[in-house]
Regions:
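Juxtamembrane intracellular "pre-TM" segments in multi-pass secondary transporters
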Residues: 1, 180-214
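Helix-loop boundary and gating motifs at the non-cytosolic
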Residues: 1-52, 205-249, 339
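Helix-to-loop junctions at the C-terminal end of transmembrane segments
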Residues: 52-65, 154, 256-269, 354
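C-terminal ends and interior cores of transmembrane alpha-helices
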Residues: 75-89, 279-292
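Cytoplasmic helix-loop-helix junction between adjacent transmembrane helices
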Residues: 98-140
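A membrane-interface helix-boundary motif in multi-pass transporters
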Residues: 152-167, 241-243, 352-375
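Helix-loop junctions on the cytosolic side of multi-pass membrane transporters
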Residues: 165-191, 383-389
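C-terminal transmembrane helical hairpin of 12-TM major facilitator-type secondary transporters
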Residues: 271-312
Length: 389
């Protein structure tokens, strides 16, 4: 079985459980008595835990095993799902978020490093961007199907959206254990500290990698959309209607990855396209924040997701082109540690801004508008100073 196909299978299974929570995640938290501001604060803690866990988990992935790192991610994800099944308020939800955050840190860097080196062993380095883009397309359709099924589950008991995660995470663990040992490990093995020193040295000398990390920090403003879209659209379409809203939104995500897959530019030369994708996310959020009714904001958030769908595979291709095998996972974690700072700062600022405001669509629209402006200003500025090679 080709490495790319193994990667697609693993990624689809690993994403399916979380996908079933997306449409009802915020309604579930609201049912626990949390406010919109507290949801943002919870999200800030999630990203803080994930970011602080990035570097040690990435070093272990290179020094110990990338397959081991992926399996540990599955274990923490399963425990996080169990914790959410029994969550009763903010503190218990926080424990669940922290478990999931550590799990996501084990995945981060190790996934991209595994498939990049597995492709190299097969002599398929030239397919790297296409593989990342295809994985995004598959992920898009998995998220659409999972979101629809999650809406059906939420109609009977919103808490049960976490139950599938308890089963899909062990299934993903099994795929890694049976199919992903060996071929995705580093070509040249380094110790954890050697991988860390090499990663820091590369970042110090590479203007292009420093540029993309700053762009990732700016991109963190998209987190304002993640947990507010369902409270925004639920009064307009109902709980079940969120499933088709989610489908329309995420189909835009998947189609954008198809566009990335067809790009003919050389690998590693994606800087202008990365900036363009962030501009699209900003235009989408600003437009959604200024719109009213259903169709105008829906069209705007589809554009927003189109930009997000382009961003991830473009960044993966841009970075992996510049990083050597022995420390891919460690550098990926260092990149996430720095680049995801925006994902921590943004929800904290949102909480500080709206914690005394009502849980209304107008509050959400204001947040989207401001975050969209940040995305536009940041992306356009960085486009002007983008690396040319």
């Amino acid at each position: 079985m080709r490495a790319a196909h193994i990667y697609y299978l693993y990624d689809a299974i690993a994403d399916f459980g979380p996908a079933m929570t997306v449409t009802a995640y915020s309604p579930f938290l609201l049912s626990l008595g949390l406010t919109l501001g507290e949801i943002s604060l919870l999200n800030a803690f999630f990203w803080l835990v994930a970011v602080l866990s990035e570097l040690p988990t990435g070093m272990l992935a290179d020094g110990k095993s990338r397959a081991w790192s992926l399996k540990m991610g599955c274990v923490f994800l399963a425990f996080g799902g169990c914790a959410y099944l029994f969550a009763q308020g903010f503190l218990s939800a926080l424990i669940a978020e922290c478990l999931v955050g550590v799990g996501m840190a084990f995945f981060s860097g190790a996934e991209q490093a595994w498939v990049t080196d597995a492709l190299h062993r097969e002599g398929r380095d030239h397919e790297r961007r296409q593989v990342f883009a295809t994985a995004s397309v598959i992920r898009g359709f998995v998220m659409v199907i999972g979101g629809f099924l999650g809406s059906l589950i939420a109609l009977s008991c919103v808490r049960l959206i976490w139950l599938p995660l308890v089963f899909t995470a062990p299934l993903a663990w099994l795929v890694v254990h049976k199919l992903m040992n060996g071929q995705g490990e580093p070509i040249h093995k380094l110790t954890e500290m050697e991988a860390l020193r090499a990663s820091i040295s590369l970042l110090k000398t590479s203007r292009a990698l420093a540029w993309v990390i700053v762009m990732m920090i700016v991109f963190g403003a998209v987190v304002s959309f993640n947990h507010f879209w369902s409270p925004y659209f639920q009064p307009l379409v109902g709980t079940m209607g969120l499933s088709w809203v989610w489908a329309l939104i995420y189909i835009g995500f998947a189609l954008s990855a198809v566009l990335v897959r067809r790009l003919s530019i050389p690998q590693g030369q994606e800087a202008a396209w990365i900036a363009a994708s962030v501009v699209m996310t900003g235009v989408g959020l600003v437009s959604a924040g200024m719109s009213s009714g259903l169709m105008l904001p829906l069209s705007a958030v589809i554009l927003h997701e189109f930009g997000r769908g382009m961003f991830y595979p473009l960044v993966d291709s841009f970075v992996q082109h510049r990083v050597e095998s022995g420390y891919r996972a460690t550098f990926g974690s260092l990149q996430s540690l720095l680049g995801r700072i925006g994902l921590v700062i943004t929800p904290v600022l949102i909480w500080l801004t709206i914690h005394e405001k009502p849980n209304t669509p107008s509050t959400i629209g204001f947040v989207w508008f401001v975050c969209g402006i940040v995305l536009l200003i940041g992306a356009l500025t960085l486009f002007l100073v983008r690396p040319r090679k």
